[in-house]
């Protein structure tokens, strides 16, 4: 991802948080993580994150999704003696379509990113609007997509070890690489 794309996404996220009435410090805004997952199409498959805290006991983040932007299917595996990350998503603004293992929906409301259909395999649908939340157990495949306006989701979880996430799509690179062009 180019540095200009990262800056534009970060500025867009700042505006989303402002609209949602969620205050972030200038330092937090500078540290917004913009992940395109190495797929080169941030608007379609990507995620923006602000990590408040991540210790060996717990983690708190804000996840920002642009309209119809999808975080690719993945799971959080056991690491060492830890069973894997358990996370609760609480929608703060907009709408998020969350898909987990379980009985598939007859018709899903999200759109699987074109060309990536083979890498989206779970379709039990949970729709979250502001104030609603859902807890994802460790080791559960899941993916999620912002609604028509996008979404802001607070994540409360056990320790986050993103570098160990297992994505269904083998092309995904979890840790972002930014090429600054200035």
Curated annotation (Swiss-Prot):
Optimum pH is 6.5. Sugar isomerase that catalyzes the reversible isomerization of D-lyxose to D-xylulose. Shows weak activity with D-mannose and L-ribose. Mn(2+) binds at residues 74, 76, 87, 142. Signal peptide: none annotated. This is D-lyxose ketol-isomerase. Pfam families: Lyx_isomer. Belongs to the D-lyxose ketol-isomerase family. GO terms for molecular function: D-lyxose ketol-isomerase activity; manganese ion binding. The lineage of its organism: Bacteria, Bacillati, Bacillota, Bacilli, Bacillales. GO terms for biological process: carbohydrate metabolic process.
